[in-house]
Amino acid sequence: YIKEFITDNFIEQFTQRIANVVSRQFNKQNPQLEAETSELRVTIVHESVARSGRTISIRKTPPIIRLTEEKAVQENFCEEKILALLINCVKNRCNMIFCGMPGIGKTECIKFFSQYIPQNDRVITIEDTMEIRYSATNPGKDCVEMRVQAGRFDYADAIKSSLRLNPRWIMLSEARSKEVKYLLES
């Protein structure tokens, strides 16, 4: 059934609809297309750069905290003592870095530990695709959510701007190049 439904024609129409919604071109000259809704993140890579053919990834990014303390221990994310240590690190304003392979749960960990940030601490999130959703998962807390945009407002710009807003916390969704330098200097 799925092979009959997901035809080349369907994939082309789906891609064009996404491109139209975000007002972007998708072709050999513009081979990557990204879009998001309140709960989904869509990435499409053109067949001119993906040798296996057009690639589509649809990821759920709900504005909820899915991980609980009980689940973290029961599903062997970490031992209870380690979890308590990490929660206390957040409560005591320690710097933390979450790294790992794509899809491993870095954003879910950030969302989980963010609930332990003290109520009055100003938090600034800096993301290219809004996935942390701090304001939604931590209602009533002081938060500024920034979105970076290639060529207009990059991570380095966002970090510089956020420092003028007197944050207690800066959360970056990605740190790959010069933004690491700016973050460490802040």
At which residue positions do the language-model features occur?
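P-loop NTP-binding catalytic core
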Residues: 2-92
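Conserved lysine of the Walker
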Residues: 106
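Walker A (P-loop) phosphate-binding loop of P-loop NTPases
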Residues: 103
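Switch/coupling sub-region of P-loop NTPases
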Residues: 93-99, 112-186
